[in-house]
Amino acid sequence: MKNTSILFILGLALLLVLAFEAQVGESDGECGGFWWKCGRGKPPCCKGYACSKTWGWCAVEAP
């Protein structure tokens, strides 16, 4: 039962990531949203997001 629950949660997380990637692929690419790969040679992050120097993707700006 415990393994089934963990597998279900991992599957759901994978589904959400794939759905997000499909949505990003359909956008016009002017700016990057959450978890968008950013940095040199890549589109800038959208308003409300900042490029994380540690991870190299767009994250929510700290207040």
From Swiss-Prot:
Tissue-level expression: Expressed by the venom gland.
Signal peptide extent: 1-27
Major site of localization recorded for this protein: secreted
Entry domain remark: The presence of a 'disulfide through disulfide knot' structurally defines this protein as a knottin.
GO MF annotations in UniProt: ion channel inhibitor activity; potassium channel regulator activity; sodium channel regulator activity; toxin activity
One cellular component (GO) term of this entry: extracellular region
Subcellular location: Secreted
UniProt keyword Ligase present: no
InterPro entries: Huwentoxin-1 (IPR011696)
Described purpose of this protein according to its UniProt entry: Selectively inhibits activation of voltage-gated sodium channels (VGSC) (Nav1.5/SCN5A) in rat cardiac myocytes, followed by shifting activated voltage in a depolarizing direction. The binding site on VGSC is suggested to be site 4 located at the extracellular S3-S4 loop of the channel. Also binds to voltage-gated potassium channels (Kv2.1/KCNB1).
Disulfide bonds: 31-46, 38-51, 45-58
Name this protein carries in UniProt: Beta/kappa-theraphotoxin-Cg1a
Pfam families given in the database record: Toxin_12
The entry's keywords: Disulfide bond, Ion channel impairing toxin, Knottin, Neurotoxin, Potassium channel impairing toxin, Secreted, Signal, Toxin, Voltage-gated potassium channel impairing toxin, Voltage-gated sodium channel impairing toxin
Assigned protein family: Belongs to the neurotoxin 10 (Hwtx-1) family. 44 (Jztx-4) subfamily.
Domain of life: Eukaryota
